Design a protein with these regions (language model features):
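Intrinsically disordered, low-complexity, compositionally biased regions/tails
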Residues: 12, 21-22, 185, 371
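Sec/Tat signal peptide C-region and signal peptidase I cleavage site
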Residues: 11, 29-33
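Bacterial N-terminal signal peptides that target proteins for export
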Residues: 3-20
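Eukaryotic scaffold repeat domains enriched in small/polar residues
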Residues: 34-374
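Bacterial N-terminal signal peptides
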Residues: 18-28
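Short intrinsically disordered, low-complexity coil segments enriched in acidic
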Residues: 1-3, 27, 58
Length: 374
């Protein structure tokens, strides 16, 4: 009996000691979590919360393209309000998130262009300083905006998906200098596109067009818009595509975002197939950078991923969502001359600005888009 009592007393003593220790541990968990928890959602960058200020209350337009000429002149392309998607964020004029969600404002089977704000220019604070509304009748959707890096006049080029055209504007937006393709007329020949998506330049002014959502090809033109060559067909094999969404160039190669086939295909400048990088998860944008890397936006997972020139994954960051710093269809991105990254966060109806963190590893930063030496 004595042994039993001693055993029982010791047992209960240990139980209470254990409970006290457990209570102390539980009490300490929140403090520990605050010190050591969390997720690194924005990689080597800090997001500038609420940077985009549309100046319009109840902004509900998808932002699908962005090009940073410099930190004080950032071009964005927005989809017409009549193509608004239901259930996405609404923004206040000052960029704050409103409580409501977007509503469909059109019949999906009867698209009629109605509203404006297709091409806007923002300053360093994210405020609208230019609205190219003078071109509303010419532009239906500025799916890709790019400034020719080899042109001393810095012409602004627009890939107008719904009008099936490429447009070249003077830098100040006062002149329409060149039209490639026939307005509103889709096709698959030397003079027509069908839902083109983007383009990239070579030093001689020639350019490659990702054509695109309906056609499955890459088309090359000279600097005056004269057709030179094309390649590609619908499919899953080499040199075949399923939604050619983005193109990039370096001194010897062309990189093509074969979006729905989840891969990057690589070609020489004449369209000869060289290689492919599978498993890239719905890439909407591919760029080559000055530090000899290839960066993509992999929108299935909300990731930005950097590769070496042989296709080896080096670094990735980002996730899906609508909070500041995360994305839902990062349709385009660009880097300014100060290293800031701008993301056309399409389904969240905004453009986001990311600035490098203090002391960030430079190897993890997205470099400036490559300008090939002449």
């Amino acid at each position: 009996m004595k042994l039993t009592r001693i055993f029982w007393e010791d047992f209960m003593k240990n139980i209470f000691a254990g409970v006290s220790l457990a209570a102390l541990l539980v009490a300490a968990i929140p403090a520990l979590a605050q010190e050591k928890g969390g997720l690194d959602l924005t990689g080597p960058y800090d997001v500038v919360v609420g940077w985009f200020k549309p100046g319009i209350e109840g902004w509900d337009q998808r932002v699908v393209s962005v090009n940073a000429e410099d930190p004080n002149r950032v071009f964005i392309g927005a989809v017409d309000r009549n193509d608004t998607r239901e259930g996405h964020p609404l923004l206040a004029a000052n960029g704050a998130l409103l409580k409501g969600k977007t509503a469909v404002v059109r019949d999906n089977n009867n698209f009629t262009k109605g509203d404006v704000n297709n091409i806007l220019v923002l300053n360093a604070d994210g405020k609208v300083i230019e609205n190219w509304s003078q071109w509303n009748d010419e532009v239906s959707i500025a799916h890709h905006i790019i400034i020719d890096p080899y042109d001393p006049a810095h012409a602004v080029w627009v890939v107008d998906r719904f009008n099936h055209r490429i447009l070249k504007f003077s830098n100040d937006g006062k002149q329409l200098l060149l039209k490639v393709g026939e307005k509103g007329v889709p096709g698959n020949d030397e003079g027509h596109f069908h839902d083109p998506a983007s383009l990239t330049f070579l030093p001689d002014g020639s350019f490659y067009v990702a054509d695109g959502y309906t056609n499955s090809r890459v088309v090359k033109f000279d600097k005056n818009g004269k057709y030179l060559l094309s390649w590609g067909s619908k499919g899953t094999g080499p040199s075949q595509f399923s939604l050619v969404h983005s193109v990039a160039a370096d001194a010897n190669r062309i990189y093509v975002a074969d979006r729905n086939n989840d891969r990057i295909q690589i070609f020489d400048h004449n369209g000869k197939f060289l290689d492919q990088w599978p498993g890239t998860a719905r890439v909407t944008r591919v760029i080559t950078t000055e530090d000899k890397k290839v960066w993509v936006s992999a929108t299935r997972y909300g990731r930005f991923a950097g590769y070496d020139l042989n296709g080896k994954l080096l670094y990735q960051w980002g996730t899906l969502g609508d909070d500041p710093g995360v994305t839902d269809n990062a349709h385009q991105f660009d880097v300014d001359n100060a290293g800031n990254v701008y993301v056309a966060d399409a389904n969240n109806n905004r453009v986001q600005k990311f600035v490098p963190k203090k002391g960030a590893d430079k190897a993890h930063l997205i470099g400036r888009e490559l300008v090939v030496k002449k």
